[in-house]
């Protein structure tokens, strides 16, 4: 559906991440999701962000017992924060970042006191927004 439209309601991304958080909890990982979304966002950026989350989760599933997602979307930006309990510092590979960076997004990571913090920010609209 996303590939056939240029813009999506931000609630579609919110609901997708919420369902993913519920699915992760089935595997014994404490997973919380908070959001504040409004407006429409680029379908291409939605796909890239959800792909990023999926690959990230696959990498950390076996080395965490708690995840926190915080999604904020408004007419200008998509901000995603992920906090992950992890005894091992995880480096996010360049290929995982490629789709986000190609779309003008920024990803930063910090590791402190057994917690990995991931911050993703990108414009919410298309290339001209």
Where are these regions (language model features)?
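C-terminal beta-strand of the catalytic ATP-binding
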Residues: 119-126
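ATP phosphate-binding glycine-rich loop and adjacent ATP-lid/helix-beta elements
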Residues: 54, 58, 88-119
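Short beta-to-alpha transition helix within the HATPase_c
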Residues: 1-27
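Conserved NTPase motor "head" modules and their coupling/switch loops across ABC/AAA+ ATPases, GTPases
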Residues: 20-32, 40, 67-72
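Conserved ATP-binding N-box helix of the HATPase_c
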Residues: 43-70, 95-96, 100
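Conserved DxG motif in ATP/Mg2+-binding regions
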Residues: 78-88, 120
């Amino acid at each position: 559906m996303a590939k056939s439209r240029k813009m999506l309601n931000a609630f579609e991304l919110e609901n997708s991440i919420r369902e993913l958080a519920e699915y992760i909890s089935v595997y014994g990982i404490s997973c919380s999701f908070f959001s504040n979304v409004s407006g429409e966002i680029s379908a291409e950026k939605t796909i890239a962000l959800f792909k990023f989350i999926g690959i990230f989760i696959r990498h950390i599933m076996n080395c965490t017992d708690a995840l926190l997602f915080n999604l904020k979307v408004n007419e200008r930006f998509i901000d995603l924060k992920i906090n992950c309990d992890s005894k091992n510092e995880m480096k996010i590979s360049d290929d995982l970042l490629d789709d986000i960076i190609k779309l003008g997004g920024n990803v930063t990571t910090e590791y402190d006191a057994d917690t990995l913090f991931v911050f993703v920010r990108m414009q919410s609209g298309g290339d001209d927004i």
